[in-house]
C-alpha cells in the first residue's frame, strides 16, 4: 500500500531562505505550499540566524512535513560570504532535525538533473519545469521555486529507493 509523504525542500540563504512543500504518492506530486523566510540585513548575524530559525520552525509547525531535503551550498570566492551561507544552511538543517524529521541533502546538480533531466541548467528552466510537474504550484521568489525543486528531487530519489527495496524483497523471495 502506498502512503502519502509530505516533503519540505529548503533552499538556504542568509537573506532569503526558500521553502517548498509537496506531497508524494507513488509517482504523483502535489503542490502544498511555498514561500520565503527572510532575515533583516541590518541586524547582527546571530539575530538573523534566529529569524531564519523562527521562520522555518513556524513553517514546519504549520505544514507538518514528514521529511526534509536541503540543498548543499556552493563555495564562493568570498570566504566570509561562504561562511555566512554555511551558517544559514546549518539553520536549514537544524530546524527540521529539531522537529524530528529525517533530513536529506542534495547537490545543486542533482536537483537540476531530477527536475530538468540534466545536471546543468538555468534557473528559468528549473522554474518552468516545476510548473510543468506541478501546474498548481506558485512561488513568490526564485528561492521558493528552487526549494520546490529540492523537494521534487527528494521525492524522486526516495521513490527510487522504495522501488529498489521492493525489488530486493521480491528477489529474496
Swiss-Prot record:
Organism: Brucella suis biovar 1 (strain 1330)
Subcellular location: Cytoplasm
EC number(s) on file: 3.1.21.10
UniProt subunit comment: Homodimer which binds Holliday junction (HJ) DNA. The HJ becomes 2-fold symmetrical on binding to RuvC with unstacked arms; it has a different conformation from HJ DNA in complex with RuvA. In the full resolvosome a probable DNA-RuvA(4)-RuvB(12)-RuvC(2) complex forms which resolves the HJ.
Cofactor notes: Binds 2 Mg(2+) ion per subunit.
Main location: cytoplasm
Function statement: The RuvA-RuvB-RuvC complex processes Holliday junction (HJ) DNA during genetic recombination and DNA repair. Endonuclease that resolves HJ intermediates. Cleaves cruciform DNA by making single-stranded nicks across the HJ at symmetrical positions within the homologous arms, yielding a 5'-phosphate and a 3'-hydroxyl group; requires a central core of homology in the junction. The consensus cleavage sequence is 5'-(A/T)TT(C/G)-3'. Cleavage occurs on the 3'-side of the TT dinucleotide at the point of strand exchange.
GO BP: DNA recombination; DNA repair
Enzyme class, first EC level, given as a word: hydrolase
Alphabetized PANTHER family for the sequence: CROSSOVER JUNCTION ENDODEOXYRIBONUCLEASE RUVC (PTHR30194:SF3)
Top-level taxon of the source organism: Bacteria
Tagged with keyword Cytoplasm: yes
Keywords: Cytoplasm, DNA damage, DNA recombination, DNA repair, DNA-binding, Endonuclease, Hydrolase, Magnesium, Metal-binding, Nuclease
Keyword DNA damage: yes
Family recorded in the similarity comment: Belongs to the RuvC family.
Reaction equations catalysed: Endonucleolytic cleavage at a junction such as a reciprocal single-stranded crossover between two homologous DNA duplexes (Holliday junction)
Name by which UniProt lists this protein: Crossover junction endodeoxyribonuclease RuvC
Pfam family, one: RuvC
CDD domains associated with the record: RuvC
Cofactor(s) recorded in Swiss-Prot or TrEMBL: Mg(2+)
HAMAP family assigned: RuvC
Molecular function terms from GO: crossover junction DNA endonuclease activity; DNA binding; magnesium ion binding
Binding site for Mg(2+) 1: 11, 143
PROSITE patterns referenced in this protein's UniProt entry, alphabetically: RUVC (PS01321)
Active site, renumbered: 11, 71, 143
Coiled-coil spans in chain: none
GO cellular component terms given for this protein: cytoplasm; Holliday junction resolvase complex
Amino acid at each position: 500500500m502506498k502512503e502519502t509523504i509530505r516533503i519540505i525542500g529548503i533552499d538556504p540563504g542568509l537573506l532569503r531562505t526558500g521553502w517548498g512543500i509537496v506531497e508524494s504518492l507513488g509517482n504523483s506530486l502535489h503542490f502544498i505550499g511555498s514561500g520565503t523566510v527572510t532575515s533583516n540585513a541590518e541586524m547582527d548575524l546571530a539575530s538573523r540566524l534566529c529569524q531564519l530559525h523562527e521562520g522555518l520552525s513556524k513553517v514546519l509547525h504549520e505544514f507538518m512535513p514528514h521529511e526534509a531535503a536541503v540543498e548543499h551550498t556552493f563555495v564562493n570566492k568570498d570566504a566570509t560570504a561562504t561562511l555566512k551561507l554555511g551558517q544559514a544552511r546549518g539553520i536549514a538543517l537544524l530546524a527540521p532535525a529539531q522537529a524530528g524529521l529525517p533530513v536529506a541533502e542534495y547537490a545543486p546538480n542533482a536537483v537540476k538533473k531530477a527536475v530538468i533531466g540534466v545536471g546543468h541548467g538555468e534557473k528559468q528552466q528549473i522554474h518552468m519545469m516545476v510548473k510543468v510537474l506541478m501546474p498548481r504550484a506558485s512561488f513568490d521568489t526564485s528561492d521558493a521555486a528552487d526549494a520546490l525543486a529540492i523537494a521534487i528531487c527528494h521525492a524522486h530519489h526516495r521513490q527510487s529507493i522504495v522501488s529498489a527495496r521492493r525489488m530486493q524483497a521480491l528477489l529474496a523471495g
